[in-house]
């Protein structure tokens, strides 16, 4: 199964403000605080309820569950209720690190990101669908962009991973994070574009906050592949 990968600009402080603190409110039965926070950010009622539902799922997470598959994934979903996020098909830092572990230097493990202690084990990377990947801290975002500009080896490695014209989408996400002084969180299946029926594309977050560049690129590629397959089957 392929991966729908998304990149979410978010700072550790925002993780605390939008997820970890509201998570405690939900555990204490104070869901009105969550809805008040959503209202402060101008969130529509439909998405405010989705936001609350994600936090309720987070509050039900058990200690043995992987952080990446639970809180990490929910963090990415929550970010998309507040800010723009970015999509690429099948390309991820987690996969690049599997091939070339040296690139882990651009990432920070969850134990160095979360403001609170969690008993959940963490893999610090994509392990399957519906999962958080790595987190690039704000300073690491800046460093990667600098190295991308001046180091041909870094650019070559990233072009191979984000092939098919996808690298500009990643760069757009990195640049947005740098300009906003945020880090960048990777996740899978937060958004799932439907190449056959684009209007039936799904997102666990706010679909309209997904930057369209990567989605259009995937849809165009998928339709070309479908047309080619149909032509070859004649």
Where are each of the predicted segments found?
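Acidic (Asp/Glu-rich) sequence patches and key acidic residues
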Residues: 1-234
């Amino acid at each position: 199964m392929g991966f729908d990968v998304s990149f979410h600009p978010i700072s550790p402080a925002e993780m605390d403000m939008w997820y970890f603190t509201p998570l405690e409110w939900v555990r204490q039965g104070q869901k009105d605080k969550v809805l008040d926070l959503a209202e402060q950010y101008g969130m529509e009622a439909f998405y405010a309820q989705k936001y609350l539902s994600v936090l309720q799922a987070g509050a039900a997470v058990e200690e043995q569950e992987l952080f990446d598959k639970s809180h990490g994934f929910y963090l990415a979903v929550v970010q998309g209720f507040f800010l723009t996020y970015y999509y690429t098909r099948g390309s991820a830092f987690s996969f690049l690190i599997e091939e070339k572990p040296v690139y882990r230097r651009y990432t920070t493990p969850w134990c160095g990101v979360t403001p609170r202690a969690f008993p959940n084990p963490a893999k610090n990377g994509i392990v399957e669908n519906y999962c958080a990947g790595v987190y690039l801290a704000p300073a690491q975002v800046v460093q990667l962009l600098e190295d991308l500009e001046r180091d041909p080896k870094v650019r070559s490695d990233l072009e191979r991973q984000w092939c098919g014209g996808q690298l500009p989408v990643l760069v757009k996400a990195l640049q947005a994070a740098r300009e906003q002084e945020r880090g960048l969180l990777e996740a899978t299946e937060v958004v799932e574009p439907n190449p056959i029926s684009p209007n039936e594309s799904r997102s666990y977050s706010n679909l309209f906050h997904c930057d369209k560049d990567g989605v259009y690129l995937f849809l165009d590629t998928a339709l070309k592949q479908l047309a080619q397959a149909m032509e070859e089957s004649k």
